[in-house]
């Protein structure tokens, strides 16, 4: 990322398919960014690439041009069936996969290539039918694609001649590395397959993956003067936890109408912050794991069209999303990972534009600041929290945005979105037989672990009668369970059964010897008649025997004494 994001290298200078050049020009792409100018000379002839570049530098277009040009000018593998894909593009998140698919269709719709978008959270059967019909390029997240690959009748990767791994470092962070290796082993060998890998950082584990599954990849690094975008104006405030919402409202009132993204660390705070902004009259969208996938796509589309002013999101939206015109990025919570900070503020000042990144360092997350400043190799300017900033300015009357009234989701509030999300999640758990309140959710029979005093049929349980002191407890057989009552009536009482049973004779031992005259042991359970008192058994103590004199040869002292006596008597 530099002040000049575009180079003098043009796409027409490469040996590209004429239809591809026409599609790029119609989409407005004429000159290359630095990562594109480095990647295309290596990737177009068929070489493997391990590229490092920060977010917003045009990595997506670099590998899309290489993939489409190969499919247009080269024939498919000999053993490929018409429905088998020829290219696979893997992304770590759904939002990034959707963005890649949107860019691919933008300038590749007229090339005759068939694209399929595969990710979780949407209709499983529709995606399966699309794959069974046959596609040329699959753009997917690893988890959902593996489900289809394991069903061999759905999709096979044996004829996939080019593979792209985007945001490889994020793949490791999300635990997808085993899934990636599983998919790579289902493709042709690395000598036949072309692999393009892109990452914000080429760490040791990323390079290990590259050299394990790639064919002598060429390492390409876009040198930058700073890790963060040069046109991002960064500043940080140190508010208390109680001042964060007030400070956010005060700063937003001073940038009225600007497209803004607010990042928080947890899904719970997405709803809390969004509700606060909505109460103050802002048009707010939310993006987190709790929001259903279709609703996330709808809200993101409305934000891109300008129908929403603010998008409150977790780090699910920090990578890969290209939204034009984002002027302000707020780190309501400082991220734990310094790389996430770079990706968050990378949503603004893309491709040479300018933007502001404003961070709040509260008591809970301020400890992340030293690591962030060490990673970006610069100090973030500190601004004071004044009483003026804590006072929001009066807002102008809201002006409806074109096309907002025709949108079906325009009237959805933040509370409605999260309530529908919770209801949908509860219905999904109920359908699967899970949940605490549904069948199968309780560990102790039916009822689902109810704590409101209701029985399995929903009716209140009768109050238990108090027990009279001295009275034996009654059998636990109710009229609601006639089988249990019948079995209990036929079973003899414990006292009668124990009285009829003969006592077992026990042989007691003391010091390893049986004791004569020991009485038989009583039954373990009480009997109606009291047992006779047992007479104590007297054990006769045996006298201790004196130690026996040693037998055999005399001792050494005895022999010495006899020898001395014989010597004396001989004199």
UniProtKB/Swiss-Prot annotation:
<feature type="domain" description="Helicase C-terminal">
    <location>
        <begin position="231"/>
        <end position="393"/>
    </location>
</feature>
<dbReference type="GO" id="GO:0003724">
    <property type="term" value="F:RNA helicase activity"/>
</dbReference>
<keyword id="KW-0347">Helicase</keyword>
<dbReference type="GO" id="GO:0016887">
    <property type="term" value="F:ATP hydrolysis activity"/>
</dbReference>
<feature type="compositionally biased region" description="Gly residues">
    <location>
        <begin position="435"/>
        <end position="448"/>
    </location>
</feature>
<keyword id="KW-0694">RNA-binding</keyword>
<feature type="domain" description="Helicase ATP-binding">
    <location>
        <begin position="40"/>
        <end position="220"/>
    </location>
</feature>
<dbReference type="GO" id="GO:0005524">
    <property type="term" value="F:ATP binding"/>
</dbReference>
<keyword id="KW-0547">Nucleotide-binding</keyword>
<dbReference type="InterPro" id="IPR023554">
    <property type="entry name" value="RNA_helicase_ATP-dep_RhlB"/>
</dbReference>
<keyword id="KW-0067">ATP-binding</keyword>
<dbReference type="GO" id="GO:0006401">
    <property type="term" value="P:RNA catabolic process"/>
</dbReference>
<feature type="region of interest" description="Disordered">
    <location>
        <begin position="391"/>
        <end position="558"/>
    </location>
</feature>
<feature type="compositionally biased region" description="Basic residues">
    <location>
        <begin position="503"/>
        <end position="512"/>
    </location>
</feature>
<feature type="short sequence motif" description="Q motif">
    <location>
        <begin position="9"/>
        <end position="37"/>
    </location>
</feature>
<dbReference type="GO" id="GO:0005829">
    <property type="term" value="C:cytosol"/>
</dbReference>
<protein>
    <recommendedName>
        <fullName>ATP-dependent RNA helicase RhlB</fullName>
        <ecNumber>3.6.4.13</ecNumber>
    </recommendedName>
</protein>
<feature type="compositionally biased region" description="Acidic residues">
    <location>
        <begin position="402"/>
        <end position="411"/>
    </location>
</feature>
<dbReference type="Pfam" id="PF12300">
    <property type="entry name" value="RhlB"/>
</dbReference>
<dbReference type="GO" id="GO:0003723">
    <property type="term" value="F:RNA binding"/>
</dbReference>
<feature type="compositionally biased region" description="Low complexity">
    <location>
        <begin position="483"/>
        <end position="497"/>
    </location>
</feature>
<feature type="compositionally biased region" description="Low complexity">
    <location>
        <begin position="539"/>
        <end position="558"/>
    </location>
</feature>
<dbReference type="InterPro" id="IPR050079">
    <property type="entry name" value="DEAD_box_RNA_helicase"/>
</dbReference>
<dbReference type="Pfam" id="PF00270">
    <property type="entry name" value="DEAD"/>
</dbReference>
<comment type="function">
    <text>DEAD-box RNA helicase involved in RNA degradation. Has RNA-dependent ATPase activity and unwinds double-stranded RNA.</text>
</comment>
<dbReference type="InterPro" id="IPR014001">
    <property type="entry name" value="Helicase_ATP-bd"/>
</dbReference>
<dbReference type="InterPro" id="IPR000629">
    <property type="entry name" value="RNA-helicase_DEAD-box_CS"/>
</dbReference>
<dbReference type="InterPro" id="IPR001650">
    <property type="entry name" value="Helicase_C-like"/>
</dbReference>
<dbReference type="InterPro" id="IPR027417">
    <property type="entry name" value="P-loop_NTPase"/>
</dbReference>
<keyword id="KW-0963">Cytoplasm</keyword>
<dbReference type="Pfam" id="PF00271">
    <property type="entry name" value="Helicase_C"/>
</dbReference>
<feature type="compositionally biased region" description="Basic and acidic residues">
    <location>
        <begin position="449"/>
        <end position="460"/>
    </location>
</feature>
<dbReference type="InterPro" id="IPR011545">
    <property type="entry name" value="DEAD/DEAH_box_helicase_dom"/>
</dbReference>
<dbReference type="InterPro" id="IPR014014">
    <property type="entry name" value="RNA_helicase_DEAD_Q_motif"/>
</dbReference>
<comment type="subunit">
    <text>Component of the RNA degradosome, which is a multiprotein complex involved in RNA processing and mRNA degradation.</text>
</comment>
<keyword id="KW-0378">Hydrolase</keyword>
<comment type="similarity">
    <text>Belongs to the DEAD box helicase family. RhlB subfamily.</text>
</comment>
<feature type="short sequence motif" description="DEAD box">
    <location>
        <begin position="166"/>
        <end position="169"/>
    </location>
</feature>
<dbReference type="InterPro" id="IPR022077">
    <property type="entry name" value="RhlB"/>
</dbReference>
<feature type="binding site">
    <location>
        <begin position="53"/>
        <end position="60"/>
    </location>
    <ligand>
        <name>ATP</name>
    </ligand>
</feature>
<feature type="compositionally biased region" description="Basic and acidic residues">
    <location>
        <begin position="419"/>
        <end position="432"/>
    </location>
</feature>
């Amino acid at each position: 990322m530099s002040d000049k994001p575009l180079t003098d290298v043009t796409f027409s200078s490469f040996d590209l398919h004429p239809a591809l050049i026409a599609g790029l020009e119609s989409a407005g792409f004429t000159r290359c960014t630095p990562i594109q100018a480095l990647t295309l000379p290596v990737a177009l002839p068929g070489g493997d690439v391990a590229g490092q570049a920060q977010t917003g530098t045009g990595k997506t277009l670099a590998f899309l041009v290489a993939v489409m040009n190969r499919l247009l000018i080269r024939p498919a593998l000999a053993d490929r069936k018409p429905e088998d894909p020829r290219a696979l593009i893997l992304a770590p998140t759904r939002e990034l996969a959707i963005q890649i698919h949107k860019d691919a269709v933008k300038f590749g719709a007229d090339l005759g290539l068939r694209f399929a978008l595969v990710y979780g959270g949407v209709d499983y059967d529709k995606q399966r039918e699309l794959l069974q019909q046959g596609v040329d390029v699959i753009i997917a997240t690893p988890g959902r694609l593996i489900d289809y690959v394991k069903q061999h009748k759905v999709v096979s990767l044996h004829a996939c001649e080019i593979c792209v791994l985007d945001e490889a470092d994020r793949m490791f962070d999300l635990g997808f590395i085993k899934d990636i290796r599983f998919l790579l082993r289902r493709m042709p060998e690395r000598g036949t397959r072309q692999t393009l890998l892109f990452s914000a950082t080429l760490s040791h584990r990323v390079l290990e993956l590259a050299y394990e599954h790639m064919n002598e990849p060429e390492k390409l690094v876009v040198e930058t003067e700073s890790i963060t975008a040069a046109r991002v104006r960064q500043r940080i405030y140190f508010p208390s936890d109680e001042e964060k919402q007030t400070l956010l409202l005060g700063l937003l009132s001073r940038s009225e109408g600007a497209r803004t993204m607010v990042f928080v660390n947890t899904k719970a705070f997405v709803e809390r912050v969004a509700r606060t902004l909505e109460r103050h009259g802002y048009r707010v969208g939310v993006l987190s794991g709790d929001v259903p996938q279709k609703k996330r796509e709808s809200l993101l589309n409305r934000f891109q069209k300008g129908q929403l002013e603010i998008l409150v999101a977790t780090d699910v939206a920090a990578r890969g999303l290209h939204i034009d015109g984002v002027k302000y990025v707020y780190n309501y919570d400082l991220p734990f990972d310094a790389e996430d900070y770079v990706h968050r503020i990378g949503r603004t000042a893309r491709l040479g534009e300018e933007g502001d990144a404003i961070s709040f360092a509260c008591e809970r997350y301020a400890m992340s600041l030293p690591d962030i400043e060490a990673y970006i190799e610069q100090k973030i300017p500190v601004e004071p929290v004044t009483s003026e900033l804590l006072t929001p300015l009066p807002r102008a009357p809201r002006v409806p945005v074109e096309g907002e009234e025709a949108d079906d989701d325009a009237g959805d509030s933040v509370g409605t979105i999260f309530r529908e999300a919770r209801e949908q999640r509860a219905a999904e758990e109920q359908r699967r037989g899970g949940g605490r309140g549904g069948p199968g959710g309780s560990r102790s029979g039916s009822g689902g672990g109810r704590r409101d005093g209701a029985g399995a049929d929903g009716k209140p349980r009768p109050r238990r009668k108090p027990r009279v002191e001295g009275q034996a407890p009654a059998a636990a057989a109710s009229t609601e369970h006639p089988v249990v009552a019948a079995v209990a009536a036929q079973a003899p009482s414990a006292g009668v059964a124990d009285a009829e049973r003969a006592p077992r004779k026990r042989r007691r031992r003391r010091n390893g010897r049986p004791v004569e005259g020991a009485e038989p042991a009583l039954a373990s359970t009480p009997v109606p008649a009291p047992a006779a008192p047992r007479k104590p058994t007297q054990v006769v103590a045996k006298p201790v025997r004196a130690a026996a004199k040693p037998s055999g040869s005399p001792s050494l002292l005895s022999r010495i004494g006899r020898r001395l006596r014989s010597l004396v008597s001989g004199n």
